[in-house]
Amino acid sequence: MYHQVLDKPDKLGKYVISPRELEEDLRLLDSLGYETVTVRDLIDFCDGKRKLPQKPIMLTFDDGYQTDYINVFPLLRQYNMRAVFSVVGSYTEKYSQENIDKHINYAHLSWDEIREMYESGLCEFQNHSYNLHSLERRHGCLKINGESNEQNRLRTLS
């Protein structure tokens, strides 16, 4: 699983790798005979609708950074490999707006970029939640201590 692929040495670390490092990974996987699969491929395999390659591997990218379009997508095309991107809905909405600052360190994919990547046949998109790890308010449908059934129903369905 990858997070951000960024060509900024001062930002590299646990969750950020360089395009060169990603290309090394892709080259190695290719040389060892691995074939990329998607979540759809795996579901179809489990449903008995398809076979998996001899050496399947799933490349996943979390959060949907714009660097997926800038740095990852060209490498996927170059190596003819597929990947799964889990995007955060609220970030995609935000960065699809006109006149928004798209700084390479933190910008996320727009709907147009997602569409282009998806239409290539190399990229599958999944949901990584709407607000990511937002702790601003409680989520879920379990009752809060002291909450009536009616209060819970109104809170969770509104």
Label every model-predicted segment:
Residues 21, 26-28, 75-78, 116:
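Alpha-helical scaffold elements within enzyme catalytic domains, especially in hydrolases
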Residues 54, 60, 68-71:
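Membrane-embedded segments
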Residues 7-12:
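Short, solvent-exposed loop/turn elements at domain surfaces
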Residues 21-24, 41, 67, 71, ...:
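Extracytoplasmic/secreted proteins, especially bacterial periplasmic and envelope-associated proteins
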Residues 5-6, 55-57, 77-158:
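Metal-dependent polysaccharide deacetylase catalytic core of the NodB/CE4 family, i.e.
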Residues 17-51:
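C-terminal domain-boundary segment and adjacent tail
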